[in-house]
């Protein structure tokens, strides 16, 4: 049996900036952020995304959002496109994300759906 081909991906983790403005900036720019993401979601480039939280919410309490995480299906040659998308994203331009602390780690995805 041949080994399955592995897909090139980037695991992107971006913390929020510090400061009391961040929660409101995230809320205010959320609709624009989602609209900005739509093209990449539909093209199959952004395959997973969501907020990073301080802890899993309990008892109906709202989560404390500390940043964002996403998986991008992209080759090494597309890293420049990914960096531009991140820097132009409404969460970056509105002061939510701290791109200076971003971690963008390449990985090879062997399983995308459960077995």
UniProtKB/Swiss-Prot annotation:
Part of the gene cluster that mediates the biosynthesis of xenovulene A, an unusual meroterpenoid that has potent inhibitory effects on the human gamma-aminobutyrate A (GABAA) benzodiazepine receptor. The first step of xenovulene A biosynthesis is the biosynthesis of 3-methylorcinaldehyde performed by the non-reducing polyketide synthase aspks1. The salicylate hydroxylase asL1 then catalyzes the oxidative dearomatization of 3-methylorcinaldehyde to yield a dearomatized hydroxycyclohexadione. Induction: Expression is significantly up-regulated under xenovulene A producing condition. This is Xenovulene A biosynthesis cluster protein asL2. It holds the Pfam family YCII. It comes from Sarocladium schorii. Xenovulene A is a natural product exhibiting little structural resemblance with classical benzodiazepines yet is able to displace high-affinity ligand binding to the benzodiazepine site of the gamma-aminobutyrate A (GABAA) receptor and could be potentially used as an anti-depressant with reduced addictive properties. InterPro entries: Dimeric_a/b-barrel, Sec-metab_biosynth-assoc, YCII. Disruption phenotype: Does not affect the production of xenovulene A.
């Amino acid at each position: 049996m041949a080994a399955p081909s592995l897909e090139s991906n980037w695991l992107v983790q971006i913390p929020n900036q510090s400061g009391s403005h961040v929660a409101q900036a995230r809320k205010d720019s959320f609709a624009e952020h989602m609209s900005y993401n739509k093209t990449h979601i539909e093209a199959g480039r952004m395959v997973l995304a969501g907020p990073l939280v301080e802890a899993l919410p309990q008892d109906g309490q709202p989560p404390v959002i500390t940043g964002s995480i996403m998986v991008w299906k992209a080759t090494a040659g597309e890293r420049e496109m990914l960096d531009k998308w991140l820097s132009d994203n409404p969460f970056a331009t509105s002061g939510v994300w701290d791109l200076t602390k971003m971690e963008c780690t390449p990985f090879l995805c062997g399983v995308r759906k459960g077995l």
